[in-house]
């Protein structure tokens, strides 16, 4: 019962869309109405408000970290509990019950989850994102590369035997890549927006 309640709680935590909440609180347009229409930090940055983008990034990462940390802190379900909380909070961000299941792509939330699973895992994945983003200026490309490497880092650090968290990390990576399928098409066509590119007037 504890595992079930923790999993549901993690999903509800993940369902808090900071892109929408922060934008509304700061009097900005709903991020689902412009740019990529994705309620995430990168799209909020297209509004031109860096503070809102940073708050969105921190909030989305924090909720991922919090959901997993709470399960670890109170020892709910061991590794299985951690794995379920990780998947649940991630799915909450992708399909938030509070926002008609119209969620983001999960990059920041996944980063928070990985930091809670193990700081080295989270930092290694975040560093991968930063390196790719710095050199290529595409948030989506950085996310895709980081998603590919996250399970590899996890296996390298912890192995695969009796490790449900490794499967959770792999599942998040697959889901994140799937959520970026339109970005993959745009990258291949040379039409993807770069980091910091503002929304077009009238969009």
UniProtKB/Swiss-Prot annotation:
The protein's assembly and partners: Probably interacts with PlsX.
Job of this protein: Catalyzes the transfer of an acyl group from acyl-phosphate (acyl-PO(4)) to glycerol-3-phosphate (G3P) to form lysophosphatidic acid (LPA). This enzyme utilizes acyl-phosphate as fatty acyl donor, but not acyl-CoA or acyl-ACP.
Disulfide bonds: none
HAMAP family: PlsY (MF_01043)
Gene designation: plsY
Keywords, alphabetical: Cell inner membrane, Cell membrane, Lipid biosynthesis, Lipid metabolism, Membrane, Phospholipid biosynthesis, Phospholipid metabolism, Transferase, Transmembrane, Transmembrane helix
Gene Ontology process terms (BP): phospholipid biosynthetic process
Keyword Mitochondrion appears in the UniProt entry: no
Listed name of the protein: Glycerol-3-phosphate acyltransferase
The enzyme's E.C. designation: 2.3.1.275
Coarse class of the protein's main subcellular location: membrane
PANTHER family: GLYCEROL-3-PHOSPHATE ACYLTRANSFERASE-RELATED, INNER MEMBRANE PROTEIN YGIH
InterPro entries xref list: G3P_acylTferase_PlsY
Pathway the protein contributes to: Lipid metabolism; phospholipid metabolism
Membrane-topology descriptor: Multi-pass membrane protein
Location within or outside the cell: Cell inner membrane
Protein source organism: Burkholderia mallei (strain ATCC 23344)
Superkingdom to which the source organism belongs: Bacteria
Enzymatic reactions: an acyl phosphate + sn-glycerol 3-phosphate = a 1-acyl-sn-glycero-3-phosphate + phosphate
Membrane-spanning residues: 3-23, 51-71, 74-94, 116-136, 140-160, 164-178
Record-linked Pfam families: G3P_acyltransf
A GO cellular component annotation in the UniProt record: plasma membrane
UniProt GO molecular function: acyl-phosphate glycerol-3-phosphate acyltransferase activity
Family, similarity comment: Belongs to the PlsY family.
Signal sequence bounds: none
């Amino acid at each position: 019962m504890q595992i079930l309640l923790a999993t549901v709680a993690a999903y509800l935590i993940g369902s808090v869309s900071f892109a929408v909440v922060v934008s509304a609180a700061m009097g900005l347009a709903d991020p689902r109405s412009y740019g990529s229409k994705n309620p995430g930090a990168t799209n909020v940055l297209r509004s031109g408000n860096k503070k809102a983008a940073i708050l969105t990034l921190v909030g989305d990462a924090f909720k991922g970290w919090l959901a997993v940390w709470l399960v670890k802190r109170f020892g709910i379900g061991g590794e299985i509990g951690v794995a379920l909380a990780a998947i649940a909070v991630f799915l909450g961000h992708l399909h938030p019950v509070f926002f008609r299941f119209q969620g983001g792509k999960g990059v920041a939330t996944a980063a928070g989850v990985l930091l809670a699973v193990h700081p080295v895992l989270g930092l290694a994945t975040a560093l991968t994102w930063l390196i790719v983003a710095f050199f290529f200026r595409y948030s989506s490309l950085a996310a895709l590369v980081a998603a590919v490497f996250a399970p590899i880092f996890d296996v390298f650090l912890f192995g695969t035997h009796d490790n449900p968290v490794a499967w959770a990390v792999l599942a998040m990576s697959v889901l994140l890549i799937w959520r970026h399928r339109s970005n993959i098409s745009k990258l291949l066509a040379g039409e993807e927006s770069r980091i910091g590119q503002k929304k077009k007037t009238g969009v």
